[in-house]
């Protein structure tokens, strides 16, 4: 069901939706966090995204991390659930997200590269010098 969100939007248009998302925090050896610059909003965010029908939060986190960054990751630990995020996308879609956030670690030694057109670029940032994020609650 890779087009689950598109199918829902075809039915409801831009009306507000509550959707489930998963994201991961990956910290490198320099204690910097990986962020991706999103194509849809031109905001920085943690790699992650919407759950597909039938997926767990952990499965979605691993899948979205691969799509957004090119990295295979494994879940180290859940960090928490955040449920106050509201995003208005440039196309008019309004979404309140319920996000499960995980600490992840990279496996396999791949290079950073985004696998979809959802990511403009990837970069590591020092925790004390983060850019404005798409969803400030995470």
Please report, for each region that a protein language model flagged, where it lies by residue.
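Conserved beta-strand residues within beta-sheet cores
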Residues: 21-23, 72-75
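Conserved Nudix-box catalytic region and its N-terminal flanking loop in Nudix hydrolases
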Residues: 28-68
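A residue-level structural signature of the nucleotidyltransferase/glycosyltransferase Rossmann-like core
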Residues: 16-19, 32, 43, 122
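Unchanged
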Residues: 51-74, 84-138
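Local beta-strand/beta-hairpin segments that build beta-sheet-rich folds
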Residues: 79-80
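Active-site beta-strand termini and strand-to-loop segments that position acidic
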Residues: 26-29, 104-106
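Acidic, metal-coordinating catalytic segment for phosphate/diphosphate chemistry
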Residues: 1-23
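Residue-level preference for beta-strand/loop junctions
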Residues: 18, 42, 94-98
């Amino acid at each position: 069901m890779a087009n689950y969100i598109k199918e829902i939007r075809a039915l409801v248009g831009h009306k507000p939706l509550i959707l489930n998302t998963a994201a991961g925090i990956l910290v490198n050896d320099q204690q910097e966090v990986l962020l991706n610059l999103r194509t849809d909003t031109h905001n920085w965010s943690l790699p992650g995204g919407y759950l597909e029908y039938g997926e767990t939060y952990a499965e979605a986190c691993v899948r979205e991390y691969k799509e957004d960054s090119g990295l295979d990751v494994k879940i180290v630990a859940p960090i928490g659930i955040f449920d106050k995020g509201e995003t208005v996308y440039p196309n008019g879609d309004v979404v309140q997200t319920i996000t499960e956030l995980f600490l992840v670690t990279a496996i396999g030694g791949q290079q950073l590269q985004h696998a979809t057109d959802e990511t403009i670029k990837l970069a590591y940032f020092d925790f004390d010098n983060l850019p404005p994020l798409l969803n400030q609650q995470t």
